[in-house]
C-alpha cells in the first residue's frame, strides 16, 4: 500500500497537493501545525477540508514554541502584515525562520510511524514570496539529512516547485476542484477565507494567478501538464 503524509495548512497550495495525493496514493495522512500563527483560523479550515476530501487521518501538532523563538508578522500581533509590494527586495517580515525545517522534520517523523513513503509539501520556487525555505535546494538537502538520521528513505515531494500560481490553479481544475480551492481554502495572511483580504502578498499572488488562469485556460493548462507530466 502506498502511503503519503501531506503538510497541510488548508491554503491553496497544500489543498491542491492533498487533492493530487488522494489520486496518487492509497492512503493519505495530513499534518497541520499550530504555532500560534496570526492566521490560525487556517487550522479549522484544514480540519474541515481534510475530512471533506477524505484523508485517512489528520493530526494537528502543537508547536507553539516556534512562536516564542521566531519573530515574524505571522507570530507577532505587534508587527503588521505588509501590503503587497511588487518591487520589494529581501526577505519579507512574514517569513517565519525555521518553520519549514521544523514542519518537514516533524512530518517525516509522523511518516515514519505510519509507514508512509513520502512527505508532500506545497512549497514553490517559481512564484513565491522570497522565503529561503521554499527553495528546491533546501528541500533536497533537508530530505537527505532526515533520511540519514532515520536510516529510512522518506521522500520529500514538491509537486508545485516548478509551476507558478496560475498553473497551480490549473492543477486544481484538472482534478475538478477549482471552486473548492477558491472558496473553501484559507491562504490570506490576515486569516480571511476564500479570496481573502486582497492586500497581503499571499492574496496578491493567489488573485493574480487565478486571473491569469481564467483569462487563458487552455494555454495555462497545457503548460501545467507539460511541466508536471500529466496527460
Curated annotation (Swiss-Prot):
Binding site for Zn(2+): 188, 197, 200, 203
Pfam name, any one: QueC
Keywords assigned by UniProt, alphabetized: ATP-binding, Ligase, Metal-binding, Nucleotide-binding, Queuosine biosynthesis, Zinc
Cofactor entry: Zn(2+)
Catalytic activity: 7-carboxy-7-deazaguanine + NH4(+) + ATP = 7-cyano-7-deazaguanine + ADP + phosphate + H2O + H(+)
Cofactor binding, note field: Binds 1 zinc ion per subunit.
Catalytic activity, EC: 6.3.4.20
Gene3D superfamilies xref list: HUPs
PANTHER family reported in the protein's UniProt record: 7-CYANO-7-DEAZAGUANINE SYNTHASE
Pathway this chain belongs to: Purine metabolism; 7-cyano-7-deazaguanine biosynthesis
Name by which UniProt lists this protein: 7-cyano-7-deazaguanine synthase
Gene Ontology molecular function terms on file: ATP binding; ligase activity, forming carbon-nitrogen bonds; zinc ion binding
InterPro entries assigned: QueC (IPR018317), Rossmann-like_a/b/a_fold (IPR014729)
Residues noted as binding ATP in the record, renumbered to the chain: 8-18
Its job: Catalyzes the ATP-dependent conversion of 7-carboxy-7-deazaguanine (CDG) to 7-cyano-7-deazaguanine (preQ(0)).
Source species: Escherichia coli O157:H7
Biological process per Gene Ontology, one example term: queuosine biosynthetic process
Record-stated family: Belongs to the QueC family.
